[in-house]
């Protein structure tokens, strides 16, 4: 018989738990792990980490390999001028000064590799979080208390908890003590289940993310103070949970394995993470190690190294696979190709000898282009496990923050020992600064590089990607905000009713008569106490006046509405495989009340797919286009030749026949059409122009930061912007093909011959500089600077003697801008070698600065970007997206005002405005720019004069308050164009209200040259000052601020990435989908939500006031006229489903009619579906119907007798309650059904279900229920003819006034929707099916006095314009 007890396993378990208890003791007492005592999580077999800095020297071979140079070329010239992005300096500082300046700087993070310097050991310990990500709100232990706490933060839930607790006191509610908890429990349980499911999904994603495997260097010393500082209670919980889990694991496996000898403290602490990944075991960790062969140091000969000559590495150091959650600050990790970056890493070395690698940041900022990153010169030698473990240095960097594009720090390493005369403490400290270009951020993916070794700088919650999460502000819809005041009014009404009941109860109790004394044995001395008790009893009785389930019902309805938006195939983009994705489910009704839309231009109104169309070279203009140019000329009523298209096609054909040097794989895709340019490029007669064309296109092929890649034998360009890609592609199409950009060498095939250029420096583009420059050295050793940028920054930097070409180029660029093209200038200069070396020293010093590095680099860059030679200018077309003009026309008819906020030039924005129907030739355009108005007072005077002479306003506060209430469409004859500098003036408090007054009189507002912060400021100004619902739409990272500021943010998934769509409330594929999102789903959702909330208050009022009227009949003693189960199930089963169905499915007209008649949307802008008038109309209707329901039953019982079929009189309170509750349930459900705009099968089914459930419950409960008084009540009352008479009479009297009013209103005072539906009903199905998708054949009825608007170019016709008297 086999043994049932494994004694070896038990023995091993004892020793393991003993070690675990020691670890827990140290953990609970917070023993810091310094200088080799590395206590961290991870399933690795750790060696002795107590070893210090080794004193043995490298072998001669390793030393020679460390000092190897990049190549002979770098040795001859670049020894004194390093890569600009990786510049470094060495400085000598004393240990005394070093310690003195760093003693207590909390703004600096220090990370030590291998050991802590002696002078730093007195510094306070720094605690770092683990790399474990936790986005869940709850844990299994904290879920119930924390979720309940969050739910009871809602004042309504807290109120109902108080009422429920009151019901537990027999003095206030002597019966049904247990049942009182059911309604609140159902609400809390439903919400808890929803929150639990959402949190479980987050937990699954967290677990998957945390258990992703990565390569980590083990067997070396991580000398930092590790782990996050957590409280004693959390440590105790972790200790208990880990102990229980590990014991269960050990007992589970004790019969399978021979023992648990390999179970140690280190791998116990992470047993959970190991078990969660089926492909990851302890054995696989030890076997799945990674060998890295040493590669020689690529640093320059004069650079310092973090590996000292007397240092030696650990022979036990090796890279092993671990879970990413076990990474700690100070760990060294290796990332392989196509792997995700597990933490924020400082790049130590790469596979490339020059230290470059490429990353994709799509998961971080949504951009799909590759970005180049660089290893530090001092750490390029760390290419193997041995060398990484031998390195000794420390890093000083910024504390964690959320900026994705900024990170400054410095690497410091001890140098050689000096004599006392040279230094105070005889220590030389080497420093090399680094920036964001040397850091790999968590969330990026390594591309086009075999491997990268990095040092962990930030982990877990301190990484950039985590710092940028959760920044989206919590938004609430306007209805939700208004609903808070409605709830407050209901609370006040409830308290007034309770106080009224208490006063009358005390009055009734004060009456001394024989009946009261005989029946109650009470006298008037207890009257005040009865009044106080009655107040609390009434609070329990009338609690449904404040709807307990309203908020959860709204969440359910909004979730279903969001699903409908997601499932709409008309908003599905097949090219991007992108549906409309709602990310904020609680603001869907705001989509139906948008009055102002703020839109970006590039990538939002346009496709962000750049096409090179025209250029100016040496004062000669090239290029023809008939796409957007034709459209703009037509809209501006300019002279347009209909034969232009044919001429362009013939010119293209002639060009392709002549062109023989292009390396374009598909010549038909060429967008730059100019046979004259090809003739000049290939001409042997006009040498000067031929050379100019040659140098211009060579500059296009060299001045960029494009990364080349080959996929399936196809050359791919990965550019940081679509503009750069367009420039490089057009150079390729005309024989200047960029073949390779690796190792900072550009290989270009020019006329069939490969040319190599060494990239010495790249001065990147910034929004402040508005230009970028590349410094290159050609094969002849000549150094060139090529610069491209805006004309406003290039022209001032040109050398003298170019007046003729400058004037011609300016005219050409102005012409290009007037045609809607994006323009750039291209310039160059040849630099003397000695001048470059002197500039390089200053540039290195600027790059080495720890503080204000960007400003210093920009200042030094100005020194070399001077005396430029103008080569020419470019014109790039950004085509409009599909149906943009038609969508803008629809939105304008709907009464929505569209403002365009763009960073483009004024001329470009104006012409895009013409092309997309924002502007027309008959408009008067008010231009406000800093060139014309240089001071705030001048801008204010201009706006006041414009308001006075054009619109008759004096700019007073009274006029502004009047305009706040005016939501009518502005004049179609005026528009405003303002630039970013002038916008700073109008955003001031002194001028802002005048600017808004002027904007309300203009159809279109174009804000040009604006920054992201200015975009957000404009949105905030309109939203807060005008008290309107705003929407912002964009596609780039620069649009995130205004998207988050607006009431509704919409992001477009485009070429610029997904930064906007990730921060938005709704993500769509193209701008044209916005029309359907607002005019169909927005209008539906707003109308449905308003109707649902009105129904909710109505049904609760009618039910509550029946109980209130009954109190007059029984002297306010707080008794129910219904059976208590009816009170409990009223909101849960009897009336809830019809309200939810109405909020989800009701619609007045279908989607196609909504799109054809955008003017229907104006009711949402005016707030006509939900306002105080509508609320009180439903409240008063409910009060009236409650009086009818109670009064009819009271009347018939007072003057008549009811006898059951058994001959028994029907006169008990339970029977009378059934006489009242039955018609009440009928009335409520019929009222909801008949107030819906359209009846459908789902509505009828839910209506029958609600009525059926009421009667099923009534019969079952009256037959088998525990209530003696209610026993057989259903069978007694329902078999009497009088019961049904009372029911029919009550229904008729309740519903007759409401539906009489509706009929009269539709006949004599029809709204626009009534006229439209009447017309639709009169039309045949054949006529309806023959209508087009963009034009409606719905004609105006003769009853409406407002005319139809004129047809637009797209064929869109408005339907009925609103007559204010009918609203």
Swiss-Prot record:
The chain crosses the membrane at residues 155-172, 178-197, 483-503, 532-552, 1092-1112, 1125-1145, 1175-1197, 1213-1233, 1241-1261, 1277-1297. A 1,2-diacyl-sn-glycero-3-phospho-L-serine binds at residue 1298. It is a multi-pass membrane protein. It catalyses: ATP + H2O + phospholipidSide 1 = ADP + phosphate + phospholipidSide 2; a 1,2-diacyl-sn-glycero-3-phosphoethanolamine(out) + ATP + H2O = a 1,2-diacyl-sn-glycero-3-phosphoethanolamine(in) + ADP + phosphate + H(+); a 1,2-diacyl-sn-glycero-3-phosphocholine(out) + ATP + H2O = a 1,2-diacyl-sn-glycero-3-phosphocholine(in) + ADP + phosphate + H(+); a beta-D-glucosyl-(1<->1')-N-acylsphing-4-enine(out) + ATP + H2O = a beta-D-glucosyl-(1<->1')-N-acylsphing-4-enine(in) + ADP + phosphate + H(+). Mg(2+) binds at residues 600, 602, 1035, 1039. It comes from the Eukaryota. It is found in: Cell membrane; Endoplasmic reticulum membrane. One of its GO terms (cellular component) is plasma membrane. Residues 77-92 have a biased composition (Polar residues). Keywords: ATP-binding, Cell membrane, Endoplasmic reticulum, Lipid transport, Magnesium, Membrane, Metal-binding, Nucleotide-binding, Phosphoprotein, Translocase, Transmembrane, Transmembrane helix, Transport. GO terms for molecular function: ATP binding; ATP hydrolysis activity; ATPase-coupled intramembrane lipid transporter activity; glycosylceramide flippase activity; magnesium ion binding; phosphatidylcholine flippase activity; phosphatidylcholine floppase activity; phosphatidylethanolamine flippase activity. InterPro entries: ATPase_P-typ_cyto_dom_N (IPR023299), ATPase_P-typ_P_site (IPR018303), ATPase_P-typ_TM_dom_sf (IPR023298), ATPase_P-typ_transduc_dom_A_sf (IPR008250), HAD-like_sf (IPR036412), HAD_sf (IPR023214), P-type_ATPase_IV (IPR006539), P-type_ATPase_N (IPR032631). The keyword Transmembrane applies. Its EC number is 7.6.2.1. SUPFAM superfamilies: Calcium ATPase, transduction domain A, Calcium ATPase, transmembrane domain M, HAD-like, Metal cation-transporting ATPase, ATP-binding domain N. Residues 1-154, 198-482, 553-1091, 1146-1174, 1234-1240, 1298-1367 are cytoplasmic. The active site is at residue 600. Residues 50-70 have a biased composition (Basic and acidic residues). Residues 34-104 are annotated as: Disordered. PROSITE patterns: ATPASE_E1_E2 (PS00154). The record marks 548 as: Involved in the release of the transported lipid into the cytosolic leaflet. Residues 173-177, 504-531, 1113-1124, 1198-1212, 1262-1276 are lumenal. Catalytic component of a P4-ATPase flippase complex which catalyzes the hydrolysis of ATP coupled to the transport of glucosylceramide, phosphatidylcholine, phosphatidylethanolamine, and small amounts of phosphatidylserine from the lumenal to the cytosolic leaflet of the cell membrane and ensures the maintenance of asymmetric distribution of phospholipids. Belongs to the cation transport ATPase (P-type) (TC 3.A.3) family. Type IV subfamily. This is Phospholipid-transporting ATPase C4F10.16c. It comes from Schizosaccharomyces pombe (strain 972 / ATCC 24843).
């Amino acid at each position: 018989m086999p043994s049932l007890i494994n004694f070896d396993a038990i023995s091993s378990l004892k020793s393991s738990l003993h070690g675990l208890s020691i670890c827990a003791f140290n953990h609970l007492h917070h023993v810091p792990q310094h200088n080799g005592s590395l206590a961290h999580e991870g399933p690795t077999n750790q060696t002795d980490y107590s070893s210090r800095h080794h004193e043995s020297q490298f072998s001669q071979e390793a030393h020679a390999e460390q000092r190897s140079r990049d190549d002979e070329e770098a040795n001859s010239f670049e020894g004194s001028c390093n890569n600009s992005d990786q510049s470094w300096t060495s400085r000598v500082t004393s240990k005394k000064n070093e310690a003195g300046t760093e003693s207590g700087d909390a703004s600096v993070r220090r990370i030590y590799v291998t050991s802590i310097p002696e002078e730093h050991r007195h510094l306070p310990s720094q605690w770092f979080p683990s790399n474990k990500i936790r986005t869940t709100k709850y844990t299994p232990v904290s879920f119930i208390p924390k979720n309940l706490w969050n739910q009871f933060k809602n004042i309504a839930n807290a109120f109902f908890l108080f009422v429920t607790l009151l019901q537990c006191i027999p003095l206030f509610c002597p019966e049904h003590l247990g049942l009182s908890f059911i309604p609140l429990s159902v609400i809390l349980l439903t919400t808890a289940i929803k929150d639990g499911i959402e949190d479980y999904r987050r937990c699954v994603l967290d677990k998957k993310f945390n258990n992703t495997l990565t390569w980590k260097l083990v067997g070396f010393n991580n000398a930092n103070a590790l782990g996050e500082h957590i409280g004693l209670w959390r440590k105790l919980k972790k200790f208990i949970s880990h102990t229980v889990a590990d014991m269960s694991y050990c007992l589970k496996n004790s019969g399978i394995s021979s023992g648990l000898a390999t179970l140690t403290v280190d791998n116990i602490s992470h047993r959970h993470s190991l078990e969660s990944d089926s492909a990851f075991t302890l054995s696989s960790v030890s076997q799945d190690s990674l060998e890295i062969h040493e590669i020689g140091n690529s640093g320059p000969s004069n650079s310092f190294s973090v590996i000292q000559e007397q240092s030696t590495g650990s022979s036990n150091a090796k890279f092993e696979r671990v879970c990413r959650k076990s990474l700690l600050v100070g760990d060294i990790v290796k990332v392989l190709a196509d792997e995700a970056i597990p933490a924020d890493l400082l790049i130590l070395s790469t596979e490339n000898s020059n230290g470059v690698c490429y990353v994709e940041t799509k998961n971080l900022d949504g951009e799909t282009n590759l970005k180049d990153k660089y290893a530090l010169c001092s750490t390029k030698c760390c290419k193997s496990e041995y060398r990484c473990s031998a390195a000794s240095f420390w890093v000083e960097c910024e504390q964690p923050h959320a900026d994705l594009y900024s990170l400054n720090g410095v690497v410091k390493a001890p140098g050689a020992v000096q004599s006392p005369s040279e230094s105070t403490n005889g220590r030389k400290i080497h420093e090399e600064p680094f920036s964001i270009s040397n850091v790999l951020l968590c969330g990026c993916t390594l591309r086009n590089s075999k491997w990268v070794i990095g040092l962990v700088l930030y982990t877990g919650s301190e990484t950039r990607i985590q710092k940028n999460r959760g920044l989206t502000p919590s938004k609430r819809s306007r209805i939700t905000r208004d609903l808070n005041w409605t709830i407050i009014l209901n609370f006040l009404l409830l308290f007034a009713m309770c106080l009224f009941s208490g006063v009358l109860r005390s009055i009734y109790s004060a009456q001394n008569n024989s009946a009261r004394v005989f029946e109650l044995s009470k006298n008037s001395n207890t009257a005040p106490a009865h009044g106080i008790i009655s107040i609390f009893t009434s609070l329990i009785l009338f609690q449904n006046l404040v709807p307990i389930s309203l908020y959860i019902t709204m969440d359910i309805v909004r979730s279903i509405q969001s699903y409908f938006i997601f499932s709409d195939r008309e908003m599905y983009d097949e090219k991007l495989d992108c549906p409309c994705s709602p990310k904020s489910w609680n603001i869907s009704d705001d989509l139906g009340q948008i009055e102002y839309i703020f839109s970006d231009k590039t990538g939002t109104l346009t496709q962000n797919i750049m096409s090179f169309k025209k250029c100016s070279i040496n004062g000669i203009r090239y290029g023809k286009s008939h796409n957007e140019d034709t459209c703009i000329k037509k809209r501006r009523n300019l002279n347009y030749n209909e034969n232009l298209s044919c001429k362009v096609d013939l010119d293209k054909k002639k060009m392709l026949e002549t062109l023989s040097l292009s390396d374009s794989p598909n010549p038909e895709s060429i967008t730059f059409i100019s046979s004259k340019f090809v003739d000049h490029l290939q001409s042997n007669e006009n040498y000067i122009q031929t050379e100019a064309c040659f140098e211009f296109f060579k500059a296009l092929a060299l001045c960029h930061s494009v990364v080349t890649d080959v996929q399936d034998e196809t050359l791919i360009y990965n550019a940081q912007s679509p503009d750069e890609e367009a420039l490089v592609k057009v150079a390729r199409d005309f024989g200047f093909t960029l073949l390779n950009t690796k190792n900072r060498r550009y290989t270009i095939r020019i006329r069939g011959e490969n040319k190599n250029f060494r990239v010495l420096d790249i001065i990147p583009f910034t929004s402040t500089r508005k230009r970028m420059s590349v410094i290159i050295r050609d094969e002849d050793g000549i150094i060139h600077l090529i610069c491209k940028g805006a004309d406003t920054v290039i022209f001032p930097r040109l050398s003298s003697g170019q007046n003729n070409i400058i004037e011609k180029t300016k005219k050409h660029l102005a012409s290009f801008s007037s045609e809607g093209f994006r323009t750039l200038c291209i310039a160059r200069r040849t630099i003397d070698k000695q001048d470059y070396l002197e500039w390089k020293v200053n540039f290195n010093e600027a790059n080495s600065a720890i503080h204000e590095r960007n400003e210093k680099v920009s200042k030094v860059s100005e020194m070399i970007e001077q005396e430029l030679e103008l080569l020419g200018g470019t014109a790039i077309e950004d085509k409009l997206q599909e149906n943009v003009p038609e969508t803008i026309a629809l939105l304008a008819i709907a009464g929505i005002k569209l403002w365009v906020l763009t960073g483009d030039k004024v001329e470009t924005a104006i012409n895009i405005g013409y092309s997309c129907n924002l502007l027309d030739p008959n408009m008067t355009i008010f231009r406000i720019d800093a060139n014309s108005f240089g001071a705030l007072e001048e801008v204010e005077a201009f706006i006041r004069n414009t308001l006075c002479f054009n619109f008759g306003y004096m700019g007073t506060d009274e006029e502004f308050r009047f305009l706040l209430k005016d939501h009518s469409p502005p004049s179609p004859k005026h528009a405003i164009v303002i630039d970013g500098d002038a916008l700073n003036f109008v955003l001031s408090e002194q001028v802002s209200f005048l600017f808004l007054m002027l904007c309300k009189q203009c159809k279109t507002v174009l804000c040009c040259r604006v920054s992201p912060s200015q975009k957000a400021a404009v949105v905030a100004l309109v939203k807060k000052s005008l008290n309107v619902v705003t929407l912002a739409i964009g596609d780039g990272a620069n649009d995130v601020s205004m998207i988050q500021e607006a009431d509704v943010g919409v992001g477009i998934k485009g070429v610029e990435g997904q930064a906007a769509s990730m921060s938005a409330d709704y993500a769509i594929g193209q701008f044209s989908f916005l029309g359907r999102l607002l005019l169909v789903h927005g209008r539906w959702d707003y109308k449905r939500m308003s109707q649902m909330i009105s129904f909710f208050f109505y049904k609760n009022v009618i039910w509550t006031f029946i109980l209130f009227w009954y109190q007059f009949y029984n002297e306010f003693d707080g008794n129910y006229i219904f059976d208590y189960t009816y009170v409990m199930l009223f909101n849960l089963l009897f009336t809830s489903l019809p309200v939810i169905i109405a909020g989800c499915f009701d619609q007045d007209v279908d989607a196609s009619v909504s799109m054809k008649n955008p003017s229907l949307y104006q009711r949402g802008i005016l707030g006509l579906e939900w306002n105080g008038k509508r609320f009180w109309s439903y409240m008063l209707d409910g009060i009236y119907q409650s009086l009818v329901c109670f009064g009819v039953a009271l009347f018939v019982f007072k003057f008549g007798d009811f006898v059951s079929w058994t001959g028994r009189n029907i006169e008990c309170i339970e029977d009378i309650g059934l006489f009242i509750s039955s018609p009440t349930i009928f009335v409520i459900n019929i009222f909801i059904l008949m107030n819906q705009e359209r009846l459908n099968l789902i509505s009828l089914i839910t209506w029958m279900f609600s009525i059926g459930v009421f009667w099923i419950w009534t019969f079952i409960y009256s037959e088998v229920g525990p209530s003696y008084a209610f026993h057989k009540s259903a069978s007694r009352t329902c078999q009497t003819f009088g019961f049904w008479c009372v029911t029919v009479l009550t229904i008729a009297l309740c519903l007759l006034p409401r539906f009489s009013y509706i009929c009269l209103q539709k006949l004599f005072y029809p709204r626009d929707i009534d006229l439209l539906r009447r017309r639709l009903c009169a039309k045949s199905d054949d006529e309806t099916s023959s209508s087009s998708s963009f034009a409606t054949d719905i004609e105006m009825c003769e009853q409406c006095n407002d005319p139809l608007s004129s047809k637009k170019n797209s064929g869109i016709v408005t339907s009925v314009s609103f007559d204010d008297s009918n609203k």
